[in-house]
Each structure stands twice: as C-alpha cells, then as structure tokens.
Amino acid sequence: MSLVLSHRTALELYRSSIMPLSGFVRVPFESLSVPTSDDVAFYRSLPIRTAHFPLHCVVSEPKNRRNVKGGRCHVLGADMKAIRLRQSNEGSLLCVVSPEVLFLQMAAQLSLIELVRLGYELCGSYSLPMAQPNYAGTPRGFSRRSPLTSVAKLNAHIVQQGNNRNVKNARVALRYVVDGAASPRETELCMLMVFPRKMGGYGLGVPSIRHKRVMSADSAFRLTSGCRSFSLCWREAGIAVAYADKASAGENELPKRRRRRCDAADYETVSSIDISSRDIRRVENLDRVADLVARGHGRYLRRDMQYDFASRQTALRDQVLNSM
C-alpha cells in the first residue's frame, strides 16, 4: 500500500532539504492506502518541522476519506506519478506527488498570480522557504536547487487531464510561466513584464531567461566583480533586459537602451537595457524599461485604455512585489 502526500504538504516537502529529486514511481490508485493515526505519526516523525501545516494525502475514492487528526484526504481516482520518500519494512511506501500533479492540485487553491509564481518556482532553480518563520516571524530567504519540472512537462500533464476547473486555471497560468528563473527577483520582473495590460502588467510576451556570472569588472553591464546577472531576452524583437544584483547607476538615472552583444555564446547582437533592483521597485523606471521593450517589438504601450490601468498596475505590483 502507498500513502501519497499531496497539495500543501507536498509543496512544503519540495521546499525542504529532505526531498529527493529522483526516484519517481507509478502509483496505481488501487494501492492508495486509507490514512491512519500511525501514518500521521510517521509523517510527523520526519526530520523537518511539520506541526504547523496539516497532512494532505490522496485516496482512491470518497468512501476512503477519514477524519484523521491533523490530516485531510483528497480524492484522486487515477494512477499517478510520485516520488518515493520512504519505504517501511513491510513494503508500504510513503510518497509525494510529482511536481506536475502538485501544480494541478494547487490550481484549485491558489489565485492566478499565486499559481503563476508557483510555476516559476517549480520550473526554476530556487525554492522559497518552508512555512516556518524564523525568530523574527519572517520567512527565511530562498535556496538553490535544480529545477523540479518544466513548462513543457506541466503542459504535457495538463493535456492528459479532463476539462475541469483545475485544468482551466492551470492552462491559463502556464501562459505566463518561463523556465529557468533562479531567484524570486527574476520571477517578479518576468511576471510584471508578461502579465497582460488588463491585469496591470506590460503584456510584452514571454521571454527567455539567461544567466551570467561576471568574474571581473564589466563596464557594459555596470557591474562589480562577482555579481550575478540575468537577462530577459526577446529574441524575435532583438532586445534584452539585463539585471544585476549590484549596480552603480546614479540615483536618478533612468534605464537606457544600448546596442551590444548580449551573450558571446549566441553570436547575436541585441539592444540591451540595464536595470537594477531599484528600477524594478520604482514604477516610473520600470515603465521606461517596458516602453523600450515594446518599441523593440514595433509598438507602443497605450495609456488611453478603457479601464483604469494605473490602479490595476498598482494592485498587481503590490501582489507581485510584496507577497514573496
């Protein structure tokens, strides 16, 4: 028999240090066990703090749901792909649903913006902290790891499902997810760029994310030695937005467009716009960046919209920049 952890429990485990990134097994839904108090106790004995969030697991049919203290059952009447976490001496498995199944499950519980942010995390090389605050009551910073899945894999899994509300929500969210984000800052910038105008974003289309570690002073990037930088590249428009965690631009200097080679490995010259974290936080600076990118696509960002774009932009920025 198999106890398969799901939903918020699976997400917290993926954010922990004990979660293996290999060992996928096919779990027949007939083998899903009915959770017992012993299962909950075994889960609570894992070497991470689990007391602050409930145990979510999947069962094969509604009659197998149980009112277990500290547990919650969800029905998933189909075979699934899961990662084997532990195996008992009796041969029973403790598994965690795959990232693809997790994304679809969370589509029923998260808002669109939250689901897109989760997609960036699953398809990126970073994890947000578990839901256990430090002494100040604030979650700790993100950690590095290999990507758990990709946009292509998430889409492939969704295609195999029915046409319920979860699938529709997940399909919409994946329109705005990009592979390869390595930090929450990259996710923030990319989300603001790709969300449509009606949501308060810039509607600039989905870019690719490229990374570069600068080993010496680089006047083109305006970086100091050892800074990590990334670029959002719109290849079809021949333009990129280059970000670095350190910059020496003047306090009131707006981002500028310059012509240079974006990546030596690509052998292509693009127009690059250098920005810093301060530019992302200042709406007028990021408006300037978005306008330059839009011109690279041969269009202008309209201001005379039928709806109040300024208020929607403020609401979106508040959710994206202040909710990590």
Report the location of each language-model feature.
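Short gly/ser-rich loop at a beta-strand->alpha-helix junction or flexible surface loop bordering the NTP-binding
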Residues: 1-166, 190, 298-301, 305, ...
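Surface segments flanking catalytic/ligand-binding clefts of nucleic-acid enzymes
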Residues: 142-324
